[in-house]
Amino acid sequence: MWLDAIDLALSRLAALSAPTLPLGNKGPAGQQHGTVFWKAGAAERLKDLGGLGPKDTLVEALAGCFARRDCPIWADSSTTRECHNLEEALGGPKAVAEATGSAAYCRFSGNQISRIARREPEAYASCERVSLVSSFVTSLLAGRYCSIDASDASGMNLMDIRSRDWHEGALAAAKADGLREKLGRVCPSYECQGKVSPFFSTK
């Protein structure tokens, strides 16, 4: 759906035939706590976007690039078990809040990822990268996986708010193999992630 929406927005912009204006920095935003699970091999397909033509679509170019069809978003309460696991591992609700900046909330991305790893082990194992919605759109624009920034990572129950890096105890509590690698690094919110892929500039 998100790829469809971006394709539609690009086609409507092209149809306007308005004068092209120079753009400076671009910073996408997305639904809070939503996660996208990229399938193994998707990184190469992202790189290949730069070689596509203006009539190609993201839906076609990235078909089969996702380990799950659906992406959990904030409107969810299915992760009570995972929240309890996190609280038990870190020493209770107060300890979770002191470590990650928030109590263990069902809608938070870390608990969603933990549930998917438990209930859909094959899908999780086939995933090479987990993005938040904001870093997903940034990755599309850049044609490569981009980092989750600290402000968004603070709403995952996974980041140590003092070091602004992934919290080892929270990662372990998620019981999701290789989660640190799948998440990539946490970056400062002001960091430039790269240049826009030629795929978008030709649109």
Question: What does each of the following model-derived ranges do?
Answer:
Residues 6-203:
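Glycine-rich phosphate-binding/catalytic subdomain of phosphoryl-transfer
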Residues 1-5:
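N-terminal helical capping/dimerization or prosegment-like subdomains
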